[in-house]
Amino acid sequence: MEEEKRLELRLAPPCHQFTSNNNINGSKQKSSTKETSFLSNNRVEVAPVVGWPPVRSSRRNLTAQLKEEMKKKESDEEKELYVKINMEGVPIGRKVNLSAYNNYQQLSHAVDQLFSKKDSWDLNRQYTLVYEDTEGDKVLVGDVPWEMFVSTVKRLHVLKTSHAFSLSPRKHGKE
């Protein structure tokens, strides 16, 4: 009989010593006043819980802080604008953070250092910087204001000057 009481399934937390006596009819009798006083003396006031499984307020505060930190990281990452850059004749492309530069001169100097060779493309003007915008058009770097360039650039290309000028639209017809 004692073993059956221990194995009885109840809908109460494990800390409660809640026992009931069964009648012959199977109906439950009220527990004694000793048991209820035992329960009320041992009950500890806890903060209200939310959801299932219960989540305490300290956990909720922790998750709220983590969410704020993640949003801050995402906003910092959005400030960094990485763009792929490929040089004609070089099989491996690189990435450049455009937010690290303030104008075209700084960008061209960085690209010059990135693809440095014996003959620098900046000094000899054998190479020209071209960018691909959001519409897929290839435009010479420096044709538009810097802010517009940063907002529309999708990819940078370093092309030979002869190839870069063949990209410009040709006029068909008499003028």
From Swiss-Prot:
A motif (EAR-like (transcriptional repression)) lies at residues 7-11. Induction: Not induced by auxin. GO terms for molecular function: DNA-binding transcription factor activity; identical protein binding; transcription cis-regulatory region binding. In roots and inflorescence stems. GO terms for cellular component: nucleus. Keywords: Auxin signaling pathway, Nucleus, Repressor, Transcription, Transcription regulation. Pfam families: AUX_IAA (PF02309). Residues 17-39 have a biased composition (Polar residues). InterPro entries: AUX/IAA_dom (IPR033389), AUX_IAA (IPR003311), PB1-like (IPR053793). Residues 80-161 form the PB1 domain. It is found in: Nucleus. Signal peptide: none annotated. Residues 1-39 are annotated as: Disordered. It comes from the Eukaryota. Aux/IAA proteins are short-lived transcriptional factors that function as repressors of early auxin response genes at low auxin concentrations. Repression is thought to result from the interaction with auxin response factors (ARFs), proteins that bind to the auxin-responsive promoter element (AuxRE). Formation of heterodimers with ARF proteins may alter their ability to modulate early auxin response genes expression. Homodimers and heterodimers. Interacts with TPL. Belongs to the Aux/IAA family. The N-terminal half of the protein contains two conserved domains I and II. Domain I includes a slightly degenerated ERF-associated amphiphilic repression (EAR) motif which seems to be involved in the activity of transcriptional repression. Domain II is required for the correct degradation of the protein through the SCF-mediated ubiquitin-proteasome pathway. Interactions between Aux/IAA proteins and auxin response factors (ARFs) occur through their C-terminal dimerization domains III and IV. This is Auxin-responsive protein IAA28. The gene is IAA28.
